[in-house]
Amino acid sequence: MAKPLVETKAKVGVFSIALQAYLPQFPQLVPEFEAQYEAFKKTLPDTIEIIDGGMVTTKEQSMAAGDKFRAADVDLVILQMLTYCTSYNMLPAVRDIDVPVVIVNVQKKLAPDYAKTDIPTWLGELYACGAIGEMVADLNRAGKRSAVITGVVEGGDPEVQAEIEDWCRAAQVRRRFRDTNIAQIGRPYPGMMDLYIDETNLYHRMFVYT
């Protein structure tokens, strides 16, 4: 496969969320969630530059992640769900950026061992889906574009990996357009964006000024 003329890496904001209230009750969840987040980041393709918002468990941490995403001018945000969490831990991170938010609803275990599953095991390995509806509803209300990728870690899930890579490629295309110069031959006067070619639409959607 031929390599592109320009190797452009998309800037992708990545963070995970969990509910702070769980952690004092079940301190073993902290290393569990940290390990899951680190493992997830390693599955992301090398065609992107990860802007790491970290593991978020409070609205203040969410706001800090949002500051990083805005400063980096990200092309996409990927959110890993670790367990149930309120949407207030998510929305501050994406409130002031106009890019799609991809929610990764990927459960660690394929199925519970019911005889051995206690509360921290359930919350830490089997409850990634707990707040998906709440997150999507809140993003819709905030006017944010979003998508959900659902699957499982145990045993591998090629469909999940393919979907994530598709989103990263789309983000890469967006970044390339933003860094591209397009020549236009023949125009009445520079800056008159309403004639011949719809320059207004090009600029609005692709940040391209011809």
Language model feature labels by segment:
Residues 1-210:
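An N-terminal assembly and electron-transfer interface module characteristic of large anaerobic redox
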